[in-house]
């Protein structure tokens, strides 16, 4: 047993070492840690494999299915940019980074859970399209209320929790500016403690998967792909259920690719700290900027979903409510705007980093330098005194030896 373990372990370390050497030799990858780039390129590889399999199936079954499959994949890419996806993934990533369980694959598990609803719905639709279509409106209404309620509640809770975190980060930056304190402590009020206990519930992949599944009960994604499946069954009589399953599968991998990229890049942005002489300030600085954008986005989308839930239960006619309906029909535009806001915030942070770094340099550093000089001088004096004492001791010993020799 021991000999085998001693043999396997060096092989494993050697493999990891070779992989790291190969990875960091690639110019455009060396700036990203493997924890960020590996999930993204893994999903790119999965998409390529799925499309190869889909091409084989389409060529064997019916080549006219290609456009429908391509449309399903495009719908997955588009739906991944929906505002509730982007906001939930970004806020969950930020919350997990403030714990001891940070994850760069929040978007992956969230989109897989979300797409599971699509897959189950398409199987039911493909098996019982004629009977299920008559009752589809009831399922859509009930699922819309459940999914929107859960999404709204989670986003508002995430917004409140990240607001608490934003206050805490601002307090730490103020303490650092005032006295140079770099310990992450200070805000330990009742609300902060309650929010920490609440968000500890979402601390593992399967819990994020469940959240994505519940979000999917809104049936917005299921409507697109399932109606596509019904239309395909109507147009292509005799198409097998296995061919119909291509639609939710390509939808899943397309949506998972975009959400994984978003989650991994936000993980990198939130955990970013420059390799400068002051990484503590850089970490606080970028965290405050991105957390502020996350709070604004979460509150905005949560309030919009609350208003959408009200109008779905009690329809109303006015310019405001009609505009809200048009906004809900173009949800991917809102998600794209949120992504753009994060990009602009990141560019602003990079461009203004040096300015704020100089402004927030704690004046206590000068005092510390003076204290260091005093300590060095004290050490020199102590060394001098020790040397003088040792010299005195050596001279006394020498004298004693001389006296002994004279007596002898």
UniProtKB/Swiss-Prot annotation:
It is a multi-pass membrane protein. InterPro entries: Ni/Co_transpt, Ni/Co_transpt_high_affinity. The chain crosses the membrane at residues 38-58, 106-126, 141-161, 210-230, 238-258, 288-308, 333-353. GO terms for biological process: nickel cation import across plasma membrane. GO terms for molecular function: high-affinity nickel cation transmembrane transporter activity. One of its GO terms (cellular component) is endoplasmic reticulum membrane. Keywords: Endoplasmic reticulum, Membrane, Nickel, Transmembrane, Transmembrane helix, Transport. It is found in: Endoplasmic reticulum membrane. It comes from the Eukaryota. Belongs to the NiCoT transporter (TC 2.A.52) family. High-affinity nickel transporter responsible for nickel uptake. Required for urease biosynthesis. This is High-affinity nickel transport protein nic1.
């Amino acid at each position: 047993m021991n000999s085998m373990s001693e043999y396997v372990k060096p092989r494993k370390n050697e493999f990891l070492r070779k992989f790291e050497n190969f990875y960091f030799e690639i110019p455009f990858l060396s700036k990203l840690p493997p924890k960020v780039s590996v999930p993204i390129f893994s999903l790119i590889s999965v998409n390529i494999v799925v499309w190869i399999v889909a091409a084989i199936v389409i060529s064997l079954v019916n080549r006219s299915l290609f456009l429908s499959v391509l449309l399903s994949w495009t719908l997955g890419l588009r739906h991944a940019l929906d505002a509730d996806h982007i906001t939930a993934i970004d806020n969950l990533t930020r919350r997990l980074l403030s714990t001891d369980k940070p994850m760069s694959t929040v978007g992956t598990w969230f989109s897989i859970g979300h797409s599971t609803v699509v897959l189950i719905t398409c199987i039911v639709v493909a098996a019982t399209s004629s009977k299920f279509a008559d009752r589809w409106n009831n399922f859509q209404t009930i699922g819309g209320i459940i999914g929107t309620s859960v999404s709204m509640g989670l986003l508002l809770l995430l917004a409140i929790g990240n607001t608490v975190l934003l206050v805490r980060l601002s307090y730490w930056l103020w303490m650092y500016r005032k006295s140079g304190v770099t310990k992450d402590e200070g805000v330990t009020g009742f609300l902060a403690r309650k929010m920490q206990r609440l968000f500890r519930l979402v601390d593992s992949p399967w819990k994020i998967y469940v959240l994505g599944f519940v979000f999917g009960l809104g049936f917005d994604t299921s409507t697109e792909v399932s109606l596509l499946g019904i239309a395909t069954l109507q147009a292509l009589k005799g198409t097998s259920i296995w061919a119909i399953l291509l639609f939710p599968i390509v939808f899943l991998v397309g949506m998972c690719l975009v959400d994984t990229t978003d989650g991994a890049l936000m993980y990198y942005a939130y955990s970013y700290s420059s390799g400068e002489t002051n990484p503590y300030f850089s970490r606080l600085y970028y965290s405050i900027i991105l957390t502020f954008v996350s709070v604004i986005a979460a509150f905005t989308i949560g309030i919009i979903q609350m208003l959408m839930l009200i109008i779905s239960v009690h329809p109303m006619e006015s310019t405001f409510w009609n505009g809200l309906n048009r906004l809900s029909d173009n949800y991917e535009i809102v998600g794209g705007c949120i992504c753009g806001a994060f990009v602009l915030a990141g560019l602003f942070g990079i461009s203004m980093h040096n300015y704020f770094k100089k402004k927030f340099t704690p004046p206590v550093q000068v005092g510390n330098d003076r204290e260091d000089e005093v300590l060095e001088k004290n050490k020199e004096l102590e060394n001098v005194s020790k040397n003088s004492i040792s010299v005195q001791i050596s001279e006394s010993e020498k004298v004693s030896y001389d006296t002994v020799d004279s007596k002898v």
